[in-house]
Regions:
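Hydrophobic transmembrane alpha-helices and immediately adjacent juxtamembrane helices
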Residues: 1-258
C-alpha cells in the first residue's frame, strides 16, 4: 500500500495526462463533445419519465428528478467500471514499452468517468432550478455519497481490469450483469412499491444505499442516515481493499496475456 501511494504521488502528472486523454478519446470527432454528458441523461430522463409515468402511477413527487438522480449515480458506476475493465489491455502498447504503475490506467478511467459524473450532476442542478425544486443546505453533503461511489467503483474496476486481461469474455458477461443490476437498483421505481422479500434483496445491492443517500441530500432535503452511512463506508473500504489485493496479485502476469 505504501508503494502504491508513493507511486501515485510520483506519477501524478502522468495520471492527469491519462485522464485528459481518456476524456478526449471518448468525445473525439463529436460535434458537441463533452456536452453529451449533459444531454444524454436529460434525454433519457425525458424518455423514461414519459414512459414510466404513463405505464406506472408511481407516487413520487417530481418523478423526473427522481429518475435523473438515479441515472447520475448508476450511469457513473456502470460507465466507470466498464471503462476500467479494458484499462490494461487497452494500454498494452504503452505497458510493454515503459514502466508505469499499471493501476494508474484503471484510476485514470474511473477519474475520467468522474468528470462525466460532475457534468451529469450539473445537469441535475439545472433541472432542479428549471423545475423550481427546493435546494436545501443538505446539498452540501453530496460529496459524501459521491466519494463513496467513486471509491467503490474503483475497487470493482481494479478487480474487473485484472480478471479481464485473462478472460475477455467477462466484458460481454458484464454488459448483461449491469443491465440486470439496473433493475435491482431503485433508479426508476420507488422502494415503497417493493414487497418485503424483494426490498431486502435490493437493499443488499451496495449501490442502493449510495443512491438513497444521494437522493436524500439532493432532492428530499433530508440528512444521511448514520447507520446506513457506516455500513456503506465499511462495504466501500472492503471493496476497495479487495480490488487492490486482486490487482496486486495478478499484475505481474498481465504482460503474458497482452
Amino acid at each position: 500500500m505504501k508503494s502504491y501511494l508513493q507511486n501515485f504521488k510520483r506519477f501524478r502528472p502522468l495520471l492527469e495526462e491519462l485522464v485528459a486523454r481518456d476524456v478526449k478519446i471518448k468525445y473525439r470527432r463529436s460535434v458537441l463533445g463533452v456536452l453529451w454528458t449533459l444531454l444524454n441523461p436529460l434525454f433519457m430522463m425525458i424518455i423514461l419519465s414519459v414512459v414510466f409515468s404513463n405505464l406506472f402511477k408511481f407516487d413520487v413527487e417530481n418523478y423526473s428528478l427522481y429518475i435523473l438522480s438515479g441515472q447520475v449515480v448508476f450511469n457513473f458506476f456502470s460507465g466507470a467500471t466498464t471503462d476500467a475493465m479494458s484499462a490494461i489491455f487497452g494500454n498494452a502498447s504503452l505497458i510493454k514499452k515503459v514502466y508505469v504503475p499499471k493501476y494508474l490506467f484503471v484510476v485514470s478511467r474511473v477519474f475520467s468517468s468522474f468528470i462525466n459524473l460532475l457534468a451529469s450532476f450539473t445537469a441535475l442542478l439545472l433541472v432542479m432550478i428549471a423545475t423550481r425544486a427546493e435546494l436545501h443546505w443538505t446539498v452540501l453533503l453530496v460529496p459524501i455519497p459521491m466519494i463513496l461511489l467513486v471509491v467503490f467503483s474503483l475497487g470493482v474496476g481494479l478487480v474487473l481490469s485484472a480478471v479481464t486481461v485473462k478472460f475477455r469474455d467477462i466484458m460481454h458477461l458484464y454488459t448483461v450483469f449491469t443491465t440486470a443490476l439496473m433493475y435491482l437498483t431503485p433508479v426508476i421505481y420507488p422502494m415503497s412499491i417493493l414487497p418485503g422479500w424483494l426490498y431486502k434483496v435490493v437493499m443488499l445491492n451496495p449501490l442502493t444505499p449510495m443512491l438513497m443517500m444521494f437522493r436524500n441530500v439532493m432532492i428530499n432535503n433530508t440528512l444521511i442516515d448514520i447507520p446506513t452511512l457506516l455500513v456503506t463506508v465499511v462495504e466501500t473500504i472492503a471493496m476497495f481493499l479487495i480490488g487492490l489485493y486482486v490487482f496486486y496479485k495478478n499484475q505481474d502476469d498481465f504482460i503474458l496475456n497482452l
